[in-house]
């Protein structure tokens, strides 16, 4: 419905476009056949419509939308703290405008408490299967996702409890990435493993050793992925 409204289609016109959209050009179905083809095409059309509108009307927002969607599709399915996403560009107001547009277009949504931004599971899956369909795009998306994590600077967070909460947020993300099959491109990047080491450091100095234990599986995966002799793996 949001796609039809954004594109100015009557229902009959939207259904006609949906039925004639070439499936093979849109869905590569890398993650299993667990939803109807028509659903995949409809979700892909939603992305096409939204990004095309941004490209024509707000080109700077389109450039921001890509790293936003890359990050949301690869990080924790439970959502990403919205204030992290605002740091993806020097102008946080433009990021806010882009997030608002994506929400109005039903591409993303807020968590119940309003603290996180979430991409629906199927939306995320279709995005990965279409826009992240080759190695170059996967590497770019991985960089965007890891940048979102590594721009979290706990040293600059004001307040002891606030620092602890931000550390918990990072631990939640790292644990989710470790357990999510679709997030597996991230642990192969040394910068992600460096982020684990930094998070472990702050968990220790902020008096939360139990959080360090919670990342044992992530440390093991980093060692397996990079090799036990890699300096970042040892740092973890």
Task: State what each model feature region is.
Residues 1-187, 191-198, 203, 207-210, ...:
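Aliphatic-rich helical/repeat scaffold segments used for oligomerization and domain docking
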């Amino acid at each position: 419905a949001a796609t039809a409204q954004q594109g100015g289609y009557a229902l009959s016109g939207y259904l006609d476009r949906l039925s004639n959209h070439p499936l093979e050009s849109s869905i590569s179905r890398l993650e299993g056949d667990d939803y109807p083809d028509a659903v995949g095409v409809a979700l892909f059309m939603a992305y096409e419509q939204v990004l095309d509108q941004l490209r024509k009307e707000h080109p700077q927002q389109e450039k921001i939308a890509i790293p936003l969607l890359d990050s949301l599709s690869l990080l924790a399915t439970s959502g990403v703290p919205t204030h992290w996403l605002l740091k993806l560009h020097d102008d946080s107001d433009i990021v806010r405008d882009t997030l608002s547009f994506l929400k109005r277009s039903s591409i993303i949504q807020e968590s119940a408490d309003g603290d996180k931004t979430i991409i629906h599971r199927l939306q995320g899956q279709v995005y990965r299967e279409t826009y992240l369909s080759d190695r170059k795009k996967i590497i770019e998306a991985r960089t965007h996702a890891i940048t979102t994590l590594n721009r979290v600077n706990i040293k600059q967070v004001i307040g002891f409890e606030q620092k602890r909460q931000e550390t918990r947020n990072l631990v939640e993300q790292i644990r989710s990435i470790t357990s999510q099959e679709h997030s597996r491109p991230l642990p192969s990047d040394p910068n992600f493993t460096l982020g684990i080491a930094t998070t472990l450091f702050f968990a220790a100095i902020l008096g939360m050793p139990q959080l360090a234990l919670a990342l044992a599986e992530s440390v093991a995966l980093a060692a397996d992925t990079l090799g036990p002799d890699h300096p970042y793996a040892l740092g973890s």
